[in-house]
UniProtKB/Swiss-Prot annotation:
Gene3D superfamilies: Alpha-1-antitrypsin, domain 1 (2.30.39.10), Antithrombin, subunit I, domain 2 (3.30.497.10). Keywords: Protease inhibitor, Serine protease inhibitor. One of its GO terms (biological process) is DNA repair. The lineage of its organism: Eukaryota, Viridiplantae, Streptophyta, Embryophyta, Tracheophyta. Induction: By beta-amino-butyric acid (BABA) and infection by Pseudomonas pathogen. The reactive center loop (RCL) extends out from the body of the protein and directs binding to the target protease. The protease cleaves the serpin at the reactive site within the RCL, establishing a covalent linkage between the carboxyl group of the serpin reactive site and the serine hydroxyl of the protease. The resulting inactive serpin-protease complex is highly stable. The record marks C331, S332 as: Reactive bond. Residues 317-341 are annotated as: RCL. It comes from Arabidopsis thaliana. This is Serpin-Z1.
Length: 385
């Protein structure tokens, strides 16, 4: 098994999923979600009790040849990407998994061993028939604890009933400091232009240091590396900003990103440029939704899933968290050219993502239409968004 190729397939799936999630979101809304968190929940579903009933759909969706391959990818993520090395200066990462399963279901003891020892998950027998609401609150409390209190009320009222058999949950949080932090002294209010033709005044961070920026046909890419720990020899994290040249060009850029295999690896700024102007807005957003209909359109039917994520960007770095609950109911080689001065002023809608560079894992993806918008863009109670 080629682990590198398997990881590349997961990156491709993440971008396809991103295209569907972002394009299906309410028009002109700020969105943040975690493909990695959703992937983990789906992988546990495929490997867990009764997973054989949906494993064919899941393997097709994840472009994987077998459950063993999915488990190999999961192991790679757990040991490399999700290892918490904050004690040595790297990002603080927490990844937690859980399975709440109805006591009435006949299960092989091997599944308990699989979840506790391989997935490092909590395995909790519960009584959905008479205590559905109590279980919902328990899962929400677990998620809140494992996301540093950032994700609250993942499962909305009514999402867990007496007909629920299992809930697979994944919680993921990330907090990283920029390799080169921004000076708060240079933060100034400037106009951010909305797609309706108006503008809002928001705080923009700025720096006079050279930045990893590159211009492509119709858009620019900024890469902001995170500080690495002294023992982070086999991984590195960066946040990417994808800024269309046109103020209303986000939809076209999203379509290109989601439909072009290898898009991320072929659009990586590899050297630092001196910029004429450099500004990116501070922002804090939260977004929650039912993933069910998105997965249905992608071939994963009869899978009920809720997801919520949040991210905050400031002068020191980024803090992000995500949680997914799946309820079962009945580097490219760039040509290096001489540096030339360009601008990177993110004063209109853009895409962003947080990625581990060596495995290619996409932890978080989002879009900003209005950085002054309220923190919560959540709409988990609807069937779709």
């Amino acid at each position: 098994m080629d682990v590198r190729e398997a990881m590349k397939n997961q990156t491709h799936v993440a971008m396809i999923l991103s295209g569907h999630v972002l394009s299906s979101a309410p028009k002109d809304s700020n969105v943040i979600f975690s493909p990695a968190s959703i992937n983990s929940a789906i992988t546990m579903h495929a490997a867990g009790p009764g997973g054989d009933l949906v494993s064919g759909q899941i393997l097709s969706f994840l472009r994987s040849s077998s459950i063993d391959e999915l488990k190999t990818v999961f192991r790679e993520l757990a040991s490399v990407v999700y290892a918490d090395r904050s004690a040595t200066g790297g990002p603080k990462i927490t990844a937690a998994n859980g399975l709440w399963i109805d006591k009435s279901l006949p299960t092989d003891p091997k599944f308990k061993d699989l979840f506790e020892n391989f997935f490092k998950a909590v395995y909790v027998p519960v009584d959905f028939r008479s205590e559905a609401e109590e279980v919902r609150k328990e899962v929400n409390s677990w998620v809140e604890h494992h996301t540093n209190n950032l994700i609250k009320d993942l499962l909305p009222d009514g999402s867990v009933t007496s007909l629920t058999n299992k809930i697979y949950a994944n919680a993921l949080s990330f907090k990283g400091a920029w390799k080169r932090p921004f000076e708060k002294y240079y933060t100034r209010d400037n106009d951010f232009y909305l797609v309706n033709g108006t503008s809002v005044s928001v705080p923009f961070m700025s720096s006079y240091e050279n930045q990893y920026v590159r211009a492509y046909d119709g858009f620019k890419v900024l890469r902001l590396p995170y500080q690495r720990g002294s023992d982070d020899t086999n991984r590195k994290f960066s946040m990417y900003f994808y800024l269309p040249d046109k103020k209303d060009g986000l939809d076209d850029l999203l379509e290109k990103m989601a439909s072009t295999p290898g898009f991320l690896d072929s659009h990586i700024p590899t050297y630092r440029d001196e910029l004429e102007k450099f500004r990116i807005p501070k922002f804090k957003i939260e977004f929650g939704f039912s993933v069910t209909s998105v997965l249905d359109r992608l071939g994963l039917r009869s899978m009920s899933m809720y997801h919520k994520a949040c991210v905050e960007i400031d002068e020191e770095g980024a803090e992000a968290a995500a949680a997914t609950a799946d309820g079962d109911c009945g580097c490219s080689l760039d040509f290096v050219e001489p540096p030339k001065k360009i601008d990177f002023v993110a004063d209109h809608p853009f895409l962003f993502l947080i990625r581990e560079e060596k495995t290619g894992t996409v932890l978080f993806v989002g879009q900003i239409f209005d950085p002054s918008g309220p923190c919560s863009g959540s709409n988990s109670d609807s069937d779709d968004y």
